[in-house]
Amino acid sequence: PLTILPSGLYFRSETGGLLLLGKSMEEDRVGFDFAWERKRFMEILWPELAEFVPAFDTLKLMRGWAGLYAVNRLDGNAILGEWPETKGLFLANGFSGHGLQQAPAVGRYLAELITRNMPTLDLRLFSPERILANRPLTENGLV
């Protein structure tokens, strides 16, 4: 199971007895510098994790990584469908980490939209029109 703390710090068990954890922070630089900062991790994330589960303070840090994380800044949810201002431009983006989990349903939905078939899934709440209208979806538990 995935545990998400109110601050957005998340963690889950990984194969081999490992623990995977992370957190996206507003002050993170945008760009292509994928250098992982061990010191920053130890100063910011580790104390929060150990405060939540004191036994975690005895864990050994093995490695870390950094990378791009696509985020829909309006509400953190997918943007699916035809862009109203450009006919024929279909979007499937802004998943904020949900993409792999939702890919099968999204692929089916977009294929049906593009071929002008009636969608068998009702995913209209993710329509690009909500972006233009500034109508965010609310969901707790996004990381």
Where are these regions (language model features)?
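Active-site substrate-recognition segment that forms the wall
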Residues: 1-88
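C-terminal catalytic lobe of FAD-dependent flavoproteins
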Residues: 50-143
